[in-house]
């Protein structure tokens, strides 16, 4: 066994892993659901695209989260990607605030699934959960996108180094800022209406 193999066999400390992950800048989303299991939602950064044929998103949720049981029972969700003015609602959905108070902080509409879609989100992806896998403390959800609603141009909300930050949008018809790191503005320390495009079900 080589030295490198020996070192790689040592488990990574969970706190060291969390510290390393805190250095990544991620988009911020509200994951919402409604249905037989009740209305619920939480703030998430563990969201990514899987495929565009068919359109599919991946969403991760801790099984200890208060939104977990309603989300799984409903089988549907809406991924609401937040803009720079949404740090307050992101903080509410990311803490221990009661569900009714979380939803009172925003204005909502319904798309295809019935899950609440934030009217001024940068974009909302209305989804149906098609696969679920348990990995460690979380469930990994594969979600078929059935409708998309975009609110237009706005700054993006990011989460990096345990702070919310804004990423200014690129000028219309132009390129992104030459130094996006300097353009990003820290706006908080807590872990934030347009046409609807219907997609065919997967």
From Swiss-Prot:
Residues 168-191 have a biased composition (Low complexity). Residues 168-202 are annotated as: Disordered. Keywords: Flavoprotein, FMN, NAD, Oxidoreductase. It holds the Pfam family Flavin_Reduct. One of its GO terms (molecular function) is FMN reductase [NAD(P)H] activity. It catalyses: FMNH2 + NAD(+) = FMN + NADH + 2 H(+). Gene3D superfamilies: Electron Transport, Fmn-binding Protein, Chain A. Its EC number is 1.5.1.42. HAMAP family: RutF. Catalyzes the reduction of FMN to FMNH2 which is used to reduce pyrimidine by RutA via the Rut pathway. This is FMN reductase (NADH) RutF. The lineage of its organism: Bacteria, Pseudomonadati, Pseudomonadota, Alphaproteobacteria, Hyphomicrobiales.
């Amino acid at each position: 066994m080589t030295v490198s193999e020996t070192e790689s066999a040592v488990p990574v400390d969970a706190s060291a892993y969390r510290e390393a992950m805190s250095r990544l800048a991620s988009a911020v989303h509200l994951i919402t659901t409604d249905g037989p299991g009740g209305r619920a939602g939480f703030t998430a950064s563990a969201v990514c695209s899987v495929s565009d044929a068919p359109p599919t998103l991946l969403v991760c949720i801790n099984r200890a989260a208060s939104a977990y049981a309603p989300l799984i029972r409903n089988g549907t969700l809406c991924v609401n990607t937040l803009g720079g003015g949404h740090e307050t609602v992101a903080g509410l959905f990311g803490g221990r605030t009661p569900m009714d108070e979380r939803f009172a902080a925003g204005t909502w509409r319904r798309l295809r699934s019935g899950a609440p879609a934030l009217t001024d989100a940068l974009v909302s992806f209305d989804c149906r959960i098609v696969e679920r896998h348990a990995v460690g403390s979380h469930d990994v959800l594969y979600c078929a996108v059935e409708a998309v609603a975009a609110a237009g141009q706005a700054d993006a909300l990011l989460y990096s180094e345990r702070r919310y930050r804004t990423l200014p949008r690129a000028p219309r018809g132009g390129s992104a800022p030459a130094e996006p790191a300097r353009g990003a503005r820290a706006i908080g320390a807590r872990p934030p209406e347009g046409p609807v495009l219907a997609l065919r079900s997967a």
